[in-house]
Amino acid sequence: MIVDKLLDDSRGGEGLLDAAGDCGLMTSPLNLAYFYGASPPSAPGAGDTGYLSAVPSAPGSPGSDSSDFSSTSSVSSCGAVESRPRGGARAERPQVEPHMGVGRQQRGPFQGVRVKNSVKELLLHIRSNKQKASGQPVDEFKTQSVNIEQLTDLKSAVSAVGKRKGPDPLSDGPVCKRPALLPSHFVTSPQTPTPGESMEDVRHSESKLDSSAALLQNIINIKNECNPVSLNTVQVSWMSPTVPQNSPRDQCQDFHGGQAFSPPQKYQPFQVSGSPQMMDQASMYQYSPQTQNMQQPPPLPPQQQHQQNYPHNSPLQFSPYSRMSQSPKYDSNLFDTHEPQFCTGQSFVSLLTGPGEPESLAVPVPAPTSIPPQTETQLQTFSLMPSNACEAVVGVHDVGSHSLGTSLSLQNIMGSPMNTTQLGKSFFQWQVEQEESKLANIPQDQFLARDGDGDTFLHIAVAQGRRALSYVLARKMNALHMLDIKEHNGQSAFQVAVAANQHLIVQDLVNLGAQVNTTDCWGRTPLHVCAEKGHSQVLQAIQKGAVRSNQFVDLEATNYDGLTPLHCAVVAHNAVVHELQRNRQSHSPEVQDLLLRNKSLVDTIKCLIQMGAAVEAKDRKSGRTALHLAAEEANLELIRLFLELPSCLSFVNAKAYNGNTALHVAASLQYRVTQLDAVRLLMRKGADPSTRNLENEQPVHLVPDGPVGEQIRRILKGKSIQQRAPPY
């Protein structure tokens, strides 16, 4: 409606176009205060400007038609008739504003900024140039208005680039005179048009391709003015010979029609202060943008490695290899691997010699043959550089001092006087050698000498726990076949070691051939001594030594009292239990010692059972089993241990020579705290309360009087078990 009024009241449509051209509102940002309706009313006498100022123009987008028409209608009252070129719009602006009656007023609050569209101006400029060149009159109003036709050139250019039928011209010159800027693999091969397309369409699109490419190149140049380089991207100039390292501004290069590539972070130059080879690691790599795959080529001969020159600051070269291929000039990174590889002997020698000299040390160091493999591992730790690093520094001649120091240190270590026979030996073996050197000049008859008790040097050494001396003496006496010589109590050195709880010496003596079933003057074997004293470790040493020396261990051997080692162990444990029941002070040192002895005896009994000792074995005098002996003291721990065995039913009702079972023995006890529990445990495990002895007595007949006796009788008669309730 406003446009119609302006056309009726003003001097005509041409004046409107001229006014728009004079003010130049479409080619420059609008006056913000006047655009948002914040300007003061026009001065009186300005014609129709008062009406125009009273009607606020709605704000629109920078490319909207409403803003163009509103600005055009606002400027129509300027009164300018003659049309001026677009370049002079800003120059004539101060002369137009006084006629508008606006002047420079104080603007309202800032509400936004209208950014000029560079792409839109470029399209309008190109369109106006083409119309001037063709001789057609330039229509300023149609040029500045926003229509869909303005984007047709851009759309055609994009579509032509997306569906080109031949090589894409990327420069403004003729096609026949353009230089080839891209490699052959970047250029798309010509395609044959499909049957649906005609040759005329192809020629028509090729005719427009030149102007469209120039338009697209201008748009790309405008977009690249802001240098859109991200923090994670490094643009490499593939055309320039050198790339400065400390100029990030120069790294942003325009590659026409291509893409900026940067090597991966893993293969960036490693900046260290050292040899030039390490400082110029970037020159040792060639990066392939297609594959991004780096592999190590096969190593070169040493002569070629000396003659090969690595240029400094060499430019990055593009090598179009396939995905599975590798570059023949690629050298692996010295710091690529995290696991250090030891240099071989050949590469280590090459550090000490020149390129033309033979790879041999100046001072030959003979490698001793008697050195165990441990020394080789120690000597390999001199070079922690990778193998390729050792080969890389061969051509450097300033490493002579380091090589000399390394060779001297190697010579000192290799040539130092050391006793190689002592390497890898334990302290015990060293002690044996020392004792042998001490006893080298002693005659053999001195080893068989005895004191007043009949003890030899071996007996005394074993009793003192001197293992190395005992081993040397036992080896010398074994050569004389006098290893089992006994003292006045009939104990051999082996039995003395068992009594002294020297399990290591026991194992050495058994390995040398000591008899494990020998007896003393009391008829005790070494197993009896272990069982009485609770030496479980000595028992295990005897078992291991007997297996190695192929000896038989008699577990059922009896002493002069007719007791087996298991019987002796049970009797010793009963004594400890009795002492614990008598002593009420649980924190006294005596009780602590008793507890330790109790534990050691239980371990010994378990070890004997594990070795194969029979629980049902009877003693020679009374015919009692180990269960009978445990029931005599109401030893709940041992009774439970024996009754938990799989073969408990074979000895739970075993009778002694007087016909008593273990239940008879437990029921007849007096003044025992654990008597009631022992009887109950035997009854639960299958003991028969109806069994009679040789005097025709049952266990219930042997129960003493008293409150505890009454409870035992009830248990034996089965009255302690609650009767079942009738089902009805």
Curated annotation (Swiss-Prot):
GO terms for biological process: adaptive immune response; B cell proliferation; B cell receptor apoptotic signaling pathway; B cell receptor signaling pathway; cellular response to cytokine stimulus; cellular response to interleukin-17; cellular response to lipopolysaccharide; cellular response to transforming growth factor beta stimulus. Changing residue 164 to A: Abolishes nuclear localization. ANK repeats lie at residues 453-482, 489-518, 522-551, 561-589, 591-617, 622-651, 658-691. Keywords: Activator, ANK repeat, Nucleus, Repeat, Transcription, Transcription regulation. Residues 53-82, 303-315 have a biased composition (Low complexity). One of its GO terms (molecular function) is RNA polymerase II cis-regulatory region sequence-specific DNA binding. Residues 414-728 are annotated as: Interaction with NFKB1/p50. The keyword Protease does not apply. Residues 83-96 have a biased composition (Basic and acidic residues). Residues 107-129 form the OCA domain. The keyword Metal-binding does not apply. Residues 45-107, 241-334 are annotated as: Disordered. It is found in: Nucleus. Residues 329-403 are annotated as: Required for transcriptional activity. Residues 241-250, 268-288, 316-330 have a biased composition (Polar residues). Expressed in kidney, liver, lung and heart. Expressed at very low levels in skeletal muscle, spleen and brain. Its main location: nucleus. Disruption phenotype: Mice have splenocytes with defective proliferation in response to LPS but not to anti-CD40, IL-4 and anti-IgM. Though mice grew normally after birth, some of them started to develop atopic dermatitis-like skin lesions with acanthosis and lichenoid changes at the age of 4-5 weeks. All mice developed the disease by the age of 10 weeks. 5-week-old mice show pathological changes in the conjunctiva, including a heavy lymphocyte infiltration into the submucosa and loss of goblet cells in the conjunctival epithelium. GO terms for cellular component: cytoplasmic ribonucleoprotein granule; nuclear speck; nucleus. A motif (Nuclear localization signal) lies at residues 163-178. It holds the Pfam family Ank_2. Involved in regulation of NF-kappa-B transcription factor complexes. Inhibits NF-kappa-B activity without affecting its nuclear translocation upon stimulation. Inhibits DNA-binding of RELA and NFKB1/p50, and of the NF-kappa-B p65-p50 heterodimer and the NF-kappa-B p50-p50 homodimer. Also seems to activate NF-kappa-B-mediated transcription. In vitro, upon association with NFKB1/p50 has transcriptional activation activity and, together with NFKB1/p50 and RELA, is recruited to LCN2 promoters. Promotes transcription of LCN2 and DEFB4. Interacts with NFKB1/p50. Interacts with RELA. Interacts with AKIRIN2. This is NF-kappa-B inhibitor zeta. It comes from Mus musculus (Mouse).
